[in-house]
Amino acid sequence: MKVLNNLLYTGDHEWVRVEDNKAYIGISDCAQRMLSDIVFVELPEVDDEIAKGETFATIESVKAASDSYMPVSGTIVEINEELEDNPAALNEDPYGSWIAAIEMSDKSELEELIKPEVYEKICEELDKEA
């Protein structure tokens, strides 16, 4: 299981990569391992305004359908259309295969996200339980 040190994380297993006022959001390696083979991703629409905590994508796997929750508030400025044709990219490269990019409306919300070293411990505990 991989946790990247240049990202922030949520308790729902989304990752956030910040570039100025834009945040790229995807699911973690821990999430894709729990979901197993991903077969469909319902993406948000560009220009959608989404508040922190709202569902912004749905990921379906052979095991389950899982909502992804927006870690920060803002407006969707970009979506990863590759996932429409190749949802398994989230399994193959969870940190390279972002789901959406958002123009953040409140960067202070980033302070509530989980640091990599803490998130790694959370995932290790989940691995022990599995």
UniProtKB/Swiss-Prot annotation:
Entry keyword Cytoplasm: no
Gene3D superfamilies: 2.40.50.100
Annotated keywords: Lipoyl
One Pfam family matching this protein: GCV_H
Cofactor: (R)-lipoate
Domain of life per record: Bacteria
Modification type N6-lipoyllysine: residues: 63
Boundaries of every Lipoyl-binding domain copy: 22-103
PROSITE patterns membership: BIOTINYL_LIPOYL (PS50968), LIPOYL (PS00189)
GO biological processes: glycine decarboxylation via glycine cleavage system
UniProt keyword Transmembrane present: no
Record-level GO cellular component terms: cytoplasm; glycine cleavage complex
Cofactor binding mode and count: Binds 1 lipoyl cofactor covalently.
Subunit structure and binding partners: The glycine cleavage system is composed of four proteins: P, T, L and H.
Function noted in UniProt: The glycine cleavage system catalyzes the degradation of glycine. The H protein shuttles the methylamine group of glycine from the P protein to the T protein.
Cited NCBIfam families: gcvH (TIGR00527), PRK01202.1 (NF002270)
Name of the featured protein: Glycine cleavage system H protein
Source species: Clostridium botulinum (strain ATCC 19397 / Type A)
